Regions:
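Extended catalytic core of nucleotide-activated donor transferases of GT-like folds
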Residues: 48-122, 128-130
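A short hydrophobic beta-strand element within the catalytic core of glycosyltransferases
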Residues: 221-222
Length: 345
């Protein structure tokens, strides 16, 4: 079936005027290559997630059209998918039922105002825990929807020659000086005491190619961030076959989220994770847990978890569960137009 998707963000802009779509695509390409030349992360996480969503739906045999305002206006009862930043998309006045995500879900008060201007049927978060940031009475609007990981683009690298024991992925976002004292410095000292080689990278300061090369030469990854709604970089490492040692305190650190949370919220840095993937730790038990992790490192199989639960196919199927419910209400069939293999996408 034809699935209209809309995206507005730093990468791709939703332009509602003649020639807007090719202009937006040109702008996206220029931005991508400029950031690549600067050595910065060329695409935002939202845009990577959006591209993966589109690819997963094409794999299921659906036809994707992006930022096609003409189609949406000609078919006002036809459900559409919105991704990226929601507020800019509200200005276009589309009446279609909307499945929102992946993207930056506005705070509850702002979202309530946007619902007066848009037909928001379902709003998604990448995992379950962020839904708890919203008032209890509004939670029926929300659903978890992860974005699939491209396991072909992030292949199993476990058989490559390894020269680095630990890839230390630093995505600390709040109270960095404090976290350097109670988290990062103790980890570095622990690895040094164990005689392990370490490569440290910082979120936002590497390209996908640099990250992939780091994964290829590393035996394991230590993932340090306060909490994630999905955690694409961690899951890309898991897809590449690296066991994960994940810092996971279960505490809400984002001040903006602390202000809006109606009650206790228990976040996670690895919301999609099981015993095949690696181990979690806190600042209080890092040494004990790391020794356990290192001794068991050959017994973890993180790629199996990703292929089973987080592949592009699984991501597309989850989208269609939610999108199909909107189509059922509108009497629109959801059969794919053609079978497609992953190799042809």
């Amino acid at each position: 079936m034809k699935i209209p998707l809309f995206f507005d963000g730093y990468d791709l802009k939703a332009y509602d005027f003649p020639g807007g779509r090719p202009l937006s695509h040109l702008r996206e390409r220029l931005r991508y290559h400029y950031r690549l030349m600067k050595g910065a992360q060329p695409s935002t996480g939202f845009y990577v997630a959006f591209r993966n969503l589109a690819k997963s739906l094409e794999m299921l045999g659906h036809e994707i059209c992006i930022n096609d305002f003409g189609f949406a206006r000609r078919n006002p009862d036809y459900p559409v998918g919105f991704s990226g930043y929601l507020a800019p998309l509200a200005r276009f006045g589309l009446q279609n039922p909307i499945l929102y995500g992946p993207g930056r879900v506005p705070d509850p008060d702002h979202l309530a105002a946007l619902r007066q201007r848009m037909n928001l049927a379902t709003v998604t978060y990448p995992s379950q825990w962020p839904i708890m940031l919203n008032p209890v009475g509004s939670r029926d609007l929300f659903a978890p929807m992860f974005v699939g990981i491209d396991t072909d683009a992030w292949p199993d690298l476990s058989s490559q020659t390894k020269t680095v024991d630990i890839l230390l992925y630093n995505k600390v976002r709040w109270e960095a000086p404090t976290r350097d004292v109670d988290l990062m410095a103790p980890l570095r000292a622990l690895f040094k005491a164990r005689g392990l080689t370490v490569e440290e990278i910082h979120y936002g300061h590497h390209t996908p190619e640099q990250f992939r090369a780091s994964l290829g030469r590393s035996r394991t990854m230590v993932f340090c961030t306060e909490h994630e709604t999905q955690g694409l970089a961690c899951q890309e490492a898991m897809s590449s076959g690296l066991p994960i040692f994940a810092w996971d305190e279960g505490k809400l650190s984002d001040p903006s989220q602390q202000r809006i949370a109606p009650g206790p919220v228990t976040p996670s840095s690895v919301p999609y994770f099981d015993d095949r993937c690696g181990l979690r730790f806190t600042t209080q038990n890092m040494e004990e847990r790391f020794d356990q992790f290192w001794n068991q490192r050959h017994g973890f199989h993180p790629r199996d978890y990703v292929v089973e639960n987080l592949s592009l196919l699984r991501g597309g199927q989850r989208f269609m569960e939610l999108y199909g419910a909107l189509c059922d209400r509108a009497g629109i069939p959801t059969d794919p137009s053609r079978p497609v293999t992953s190799a042809s996408v």
